[in-house]
């Protein structure tokens, strides 16, 4: 994973802005910390607008316990200090109160980490810490106890969540993955379904690696810029997280795709990976979706762009087995047409089944407990379909939450739409 070339104070201000902009914290809530190589802990301040933090606002605590800076440190700094001093392998803490994870903390129940691959591996061992007064030594001791026992993620009763990692970049990716997993679980509950847990054997399927020869140079700058714009847009619209989501775009002799294990929002055009057959750009590792992307492009000349996502509402359908019905509104059907569903593990064990069935007329493939694959005639078309898919899934979840009855467009009305719009 590429780390940002920033000083600790700059990094804390940057990620706090991202937290706030993504509605994962409030003006007064949440705090971030970094322990540097000299044993100095940098931490966000107390009582300063989280939407407009600057590096000059960040506080620091030296090894002798002296606090420096123009504000007061976060009231939670005792537990940051306790955790980072007790775990030398951790160099960053993230604490926040996103709505979905607070819901779990109020129920005093852990979000399911094993309904999608990669979440548990990224977030590490998770536990719940007993409630204690915010900012108290008691709370710090309760949290530090869980981290000392090997946890990297701790849910706080009636409070929020704390994550520790080797870098703030990694902690942020863990946090967004956990939040999306929590929101996916809530969406499944709204559908009155239980999310299917994956077994260790099923999760192990994801250990399959594909080797690519390092032999290509990168080009297609215009395509790369457009892909980055779409990645940012998808992230800002909560379709991607820093840890999940990718686009693939056809080129003359292959395709370009996101790199593996990089923050989606921080990915730059030069980091995207060009793939041709079994070759890719030197020194780069393409997304885990490169294999299926190549197969789809090879089989379907009309498909120019592909999106891969784990957006929470549609993933509620993917992890629960609930049926997604695209016959909701005319605009939705025109955009989405028909969807296909494949069992978990198909990406690794039988990718040709996905490549054979996806098409412009059936552009959506829901891979159970894994992801959705969206095919389009352009990057914008793929993005539009992905966005409409998530909006539609949210509407269906809302109907279930209201204990309502879905009245879809009839088959006769669907035929009328198909004739009118030449579908």
Where are the regions that the model predicts?
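Glycine-rich flexible loops
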Residues: 1-423
């Amino acid at each position: 994973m590429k780390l940002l070339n920033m000083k600790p104070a700059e990094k804390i201000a940057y990620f706090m802005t991202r937290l706030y902009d993504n509605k994962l914290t409030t003006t007064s809530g949440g705090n971030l910390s970094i322990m540097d190589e000299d044993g100095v802990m940098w931490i966000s301040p107390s009582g300063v607008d989280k939407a407009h933090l600057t590096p000059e606002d960040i506080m620091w605590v030296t090894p002798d316990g002296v606090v420096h800076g123009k504000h007061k440190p976060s009231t939670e700094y005792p537990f940051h200090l306790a955790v980072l001093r007790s775990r030398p392998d951790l160099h960053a803490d993230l604490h926040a109160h996103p709505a979905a994870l607070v819901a779990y903390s109020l129920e005093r129940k852990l979000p399911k980490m094993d309904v999608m691959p990669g979440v548990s591996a990224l977030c590490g061992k998770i536990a719940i810490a007993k409630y204690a007064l915010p900012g108290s030594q008691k709370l710090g001791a309760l949290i530090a106890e869980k981290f000392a026992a090997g946890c990297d993620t701790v849910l706080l009763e009636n409070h929020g969540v704390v994550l520790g990692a080797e870098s703030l970049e990694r902690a942020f990716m863990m946090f967004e993955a956990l939040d999306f997993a929590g929101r996916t679980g809530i969406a499944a509950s709204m559908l009155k379904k239980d999310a299917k847990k994956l077994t260790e054997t099923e999760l192990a399927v994801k250990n399959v690696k594909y080797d690519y020869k390092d032999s290509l140079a990168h080009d297609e700058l215009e395509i790369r810029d457009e892909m980055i714009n779409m990645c940012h847009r998808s992230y800002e619209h909560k379709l991607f997280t820093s840890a999940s989501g990718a686009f693939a775009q056809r080129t003359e002799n292959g395709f370009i795709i996101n790199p593996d294990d990089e923050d989606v929002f921080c990915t730059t055009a030069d980091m995207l990976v060009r793939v041709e057959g079994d070759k890719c750009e030197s020194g780069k590792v393409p997304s885990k979706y490169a294999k299926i992307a190549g197969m789809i492009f090879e089989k379907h000349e009309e498909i120019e762009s592909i999106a891969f996502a784990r957006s929470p509402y549609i993933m509620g359908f993917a992890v629960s087995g609930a049926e997604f019905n695209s016959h909701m509104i005319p605009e939705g059907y025109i955009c989405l047409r028909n969807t296909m569903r494949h069992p978990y593990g198909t990406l690794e064990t039988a990718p040709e089944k996905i490549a054979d069935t996806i098409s412009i007329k059936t552009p959506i493939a829901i891979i159970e407990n894994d992801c959705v694959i969206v095919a389009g005639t352009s990057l914008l078309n793929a993005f539009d379909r992905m966005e409409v898919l998530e909006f539609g899934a949210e509407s269906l979840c809302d109907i279930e939450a209201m204990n309502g009855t879905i009245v879809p467009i009839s088959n006769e009305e669907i035929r009328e739409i198909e004739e009118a719009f030449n579908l």
